[in-house]
Amino acid sequence: MAEKFTQHTGLVVPLDAANVDTDAIIPKQFLQKVTRTGFGAHLFNDWRFLDEKGQQPNPEFVLNFPEYKGASILLARENFGCGSSREHAPWALTDYGFKVVIAPSFADIFYGNSFNNQLLPVKLSDEEVDELFALVKANPGIKFEVDLEAQVVKAGDKTYSFKIDDFRRHCMLNGLDSIGLTLQHESAIAAYEEKQPSFMR
């Protein structure tokens, strides 16, 4: 079972860039591992650090600004997560501590992979995202509340509605990954298997 996602309130960091691809999110040299942990250290590695080893932080990159330390909501521009289909991209984001990414649009494969890894991708209109960038710029350190049950983002004195399809919403609200979803039907699967001839078991 994965962690349930119902509602999250967190610090917002504004990444004011469109077409952020998966190679920028987690560069290919860090993909050797097959477990989901440890990738956060290399998130946006080529942007966060001035050296290849990731030991010299880039003071001009927004994730390194002290006011955004501990951010758990990433605000981005259109076509976030484009490029190759590596599942390591949402792994890196969640391992770093992000729970939500808000953007006008996402690459399709990244969008699906995010739900599989309990990272909530929230689509809002370009105009709404513009408003949120302006709000964060004027109020560094602001927190947003993201409510998956009500499908709204509360930011400042405004509320923004978003839509997640019923199946994905059900899975996230109940902490169901593909294994957990299968286990929901364990008794039905067992009953089906019992009906099969012995040579097919």
UniProtKB/Swiss-Prot annotation:
Official protein name in the record: 3-isopropylmalate dehydratase small subunit
Coiled coil region boundaries: none
GO cellular component: 3-isopropylmalate dehydratase complex
Annotated TM spans: none
Molecular function GO labels: 3-isopropylmalate dehydratase activity
Reaction catalyzed: (2R,3S)-3-isopropylmalate = (2S)-2-isopropylmalate
Biological or metabolic pathway of the protein: Amino-acid biosynthesis; L-leucine biosynthesis; L-leucine from 3-methyl-2-oxobutanoate: step 2/4
Gene, per the UniProt record: leuD
Function as written in the Swiss-Prot or TrEMBL entry: Catalyzes the isomerization between 2-isopropylmalate and 3-isopropylmalate, via the formation of 2-isopropylmaleate.
EC annotation from Swiss-Prot or TrEMBL: 4.2.1.33
Sequence similarity: Belongs to the LeuD family. LeuD type 1 subfamily.
Quaternary context: Heterodimer of LeuC and LeuD.
Organism: Citrobacter koseri (strain ATCC BAA-895 / CDC 4225-83 / SGSC4696)
Database matches in SUPFAM superfamilies: LeuD/IlvD-like
Swiss-Prot/TrEMBL GO biological process terms: L-leucine biosynthetic process
Pfam families noted in UniProt: Aconitase_C
Disulfide links within the chain: none
Keywords noted in UniProt: Amino-acid biosynthesis, Branched-chain amino acid biosynthesis, Leucine biosynthesis, Lyase
